[in-house]
């Protein structure tokens, strides 16, 4: 799933959620919910359901073997279902015929992806919330702290660090709202059977779908979405936007923390940010992680959009490509969110250096120009804006 280089750009939590064991466990949760729902409606014997449910425990399975065999099968679900049947047969051979009954591989895999994505989304929302709180606190504290406003990387006039902080926070607030709006539509149960009609469910497909969705805490679909990927991809697009907004914050921090600028610095701790042979340096590791995520997210999102035209009822290749692109996007989004949730609460702000940089610009300009564009009295406009925006964003 990940390389050694992916590891330090990610979080251990998200890597674990999308790990082999977690995905197999999520598919087993699908199979248990399926058997439970079908038995409750009389489609399969209760004794068979109990045998299946009791066997859907990831510790009973050789996950590494399932993953190895998936390459030959072309699907993670196929060797998983075979292994589940083999294991159920050890306890109740009559129940084997009811394992995975009436559904298809994509049902299990899409549902599993929704389950593990939900776990990581909760972490992303938590960490982005921490970042927003930190930024709004900084904005309130530094509403009146003068700062050079830079356009096209050049000093342009006076703003305040508070305005900068609300400018960082506002897109994150909007992203959280949009994520919460699109997530319920994306995090849906997948259940369509072989061609999406649930023909094997004896007319009880909608009831089974509702029971399973409630069991798993997912949204119940009105029909299968095997090749209707719009709501799923919409969630991916929102994650891409979030990563871009976090990357903008990180890029500003990197520029402001240069020795020549020295206006902010990431928090420091033993073993973090120190170079291999230059003890005088402190590298902005958290910002580096967020910038790396922002560099990679556009390609991931573009790939999700590219594979949306999926043929007929089930796709050969496009869906599989989507599966490969999805985890790295979500994982890097959480890596970025976690990094900024570390950096912003402990961000070191050097207001004296901010003032000194303004003085240096003023000294380099004719007095009339300096007084027009870099008079410290201009900060009152920024202060009012920062205070107003903090109140709006906290509302």
For the regions a protein language model found, what residue spans apply to each?
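Short amphipathic alpha-helical segments with heptad-repeat character
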Residues: 118-125, 129, 136, 166-169, ...
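Long, amphipathic alpha-helical stalk/connector segments used for oligomerization, subunit docking
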Residues: 296-367
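Glycine-rich anion/phosphate-binding loop at the beta-strand->alpha-helix junction
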Residues: 175, 225-312
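A structural signal for small-residue-enriched, beta-sheet-centric alpha/beta enzyme cores
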Residues: 105, 208, 215, 219-223, ...
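Amphipathic, heptad-repeat alpha-helical segments used for oligomerization and assembly
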Residues: 218-239, 316-317, 368-373
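Short beta-alpha connecting loops at secondary-structure transitions
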Residues: 15-19, 65-67, 272-289, 311-328, ...
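Generic, well-ordered alpha-helical scaffold segments in large soluble proteins
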Residues: 33, 37, 83, 87, ...
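A helix-coil-helix interface module used to build multimeric assemblies
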Residues: 1-192, 198, 204-209, 220, ...
